[in-house]
UniProtKB/Swiss-Prot annotation:
GO molecular function terms attached to this record: 3-oxoacyl-[acyl-carrier-protein] synthase activity; beta-ketoacyl-acyl-carrier-protein synthase III activity
Catalytic activity: malonyl-[ACP] + acetyl-CoA + H(+) = 3-oxobutanoyl-[ACP] + CO2 + CoA
Main location: cytoplasm
One Pfam family of this chain: ACP_syn_III
Listed GO CC annotations: cytoplasm
Annotated family: Belongs to the thiolase-like superfamily. FabH family.
Naturally occurring in which organism (per UniProt): Wolbachia pipientis subsp. Culex pipiens (strain wPip)
Record localization: Cytoplasm
Annotated region (ACP-binding), positions in chain: 246-250
Lineage of producing organism: Bacteria, Pseudomonadati, Pseudomonadota, Alphaproteobacteria, Rickettsiales
Protein name: Beta-ketoacyl-[acyl-carrier-protein] synthase III
Transmembrane segments: none
Length: 318
């Protein structure tokens, strides 16, 4: 049976690194306070001239090089982002132009921190149903530093900028994407921006009810894992690696504890990258592969939750 297979991964981190001590010069906080509550030590920040599409293109080129394919072989480009260059056109079409990719159709997916999970699910469906798609390029890219309130210590310490990408192809065999699940609940308005094009004519800044986000994140991420296991007749011990959205170490630890899953089998990059929203999971996936943690044949579960609320999972055999 043909499955969507992740052929390669890529990532890009802006050169500028902002430490907790440097943030303490901006708002009333300190390194110990941030580490204890979030697990974050530093975050990467885009240069003034860098755009989300630039980060996306760099991650894409990294993935394309590893895949050893021609850009002209790519038939689909999906960019998951909350921070596009412009309201229109889509970030994906800008990326397509910068890559000089002539044979793809492209569009954005906006599901906040769950964006990459949503984008992979869409790509999985499209690559199976469209014969013209030989390879799909799926990117999560964010410049979250542009939509945080740098006077709000409860949110500005949490986020960073980055991009991660994967090349997906349809392939016969046991490896590949096994299942996905997506959920949303528009009634849970606990993470949002205080503006938007049609309401305030600007993008606004991030607002968050931290306590409620923690509660919902732990409950829904745990439920998403349990749903995936049930649908595939698996037990938690069958999972080789868990890659959760890199939002906060406390959320990750609470989910792992509820699942009775060994923390040693969890990919954690939140200390180095902070919360990079839709880029979080592809960035962590690329890191885990480059560090030879994830190996061929491993069963890997990706889980995420974001504003909306949106949440979901992707189960794959690498």
């Amino acid at each position: 049976m043909s499955k969507s297979f992740i052929l390669s991964t890529g990532s890009y981190l802006p050169k500028k690194i902002l430490s907790n001590n440097e943030i303490a010069l901006i708002v009333e906080t300190n390194d110990e306070w941030i580490r204890q509550r979030t697990g974050i030590v530093q975050r990467h920040i885009a240069d003034e001239g860098e755009l989300t599409s630039d980060l996306a293109v760099n991650a894409a080129k990294n993935a394309i090089e590893k895949a050893k394919i021609s850009i002209d072989e790519i038939g689909l480009i999906i960019v998951a982002t909350t921070t596009p260059d412009k309201t229109l056109p889509s970030c994906a079409t800008i990326v397509q132009s910068k890559l000089k990719c002539k044979n793809a159709f492209s569009f954005d997916v906006q599901a906040a921190c769950s964006g990459f999970i949503y984008a992979v699910t869409v790509a999985d469906s499209l690559i199976k149903s469209h014969n013209r798609i030989k390879y799909a390029l799926v990117i999560g890219a964010e410049i979250m530093s542009r939509i945080v309130d740098w006077e709000d210590r409860s949110t500005c310490v949490l986020f960073g900028d980055s991009a991660g990408a994967v090349i997906i192809k349809s392939e016969m065999g046991s490896s590949g994407i096994i299942s996905t699940n997506l959920h949303s609940d528009g009634n849970v308005d606990i993470l949002c921006t205080n503006g938007g094009v049609s309401s305030t004519r600007d993008s606004g800044k991030i607002l968050m009810n931290g306590r409620e986000v923690f509660k919902h994140a732990v409950d829904k991420l745990t439920a998403s894992v349990e749903e995936t296991l049930k649908c595939n007749n698996l037990k938690i011990i069958d999972i080789d690696w868990l890659i959760p959205h890199q939002a906060n170490i406390r959320i990750i630890e609470a989910v792992v504890k509820k699942l009775d899953f060994p923390i040693e089998k969890v990919i954690n990059t939140v200390d180095k990258h902070a919360n990079t929203s839709a880029a979080s999971i592809p960035l962590a996936l690329d890191y885990a592969i480059q560090e030879s943690k994830i190996k061929s044949g491993n069963l890997v579960l990706l889980i995420s939750i974001g504003a909306g609320l949106t949440w979901g999972s992707v189960l794959l055999r690498y």
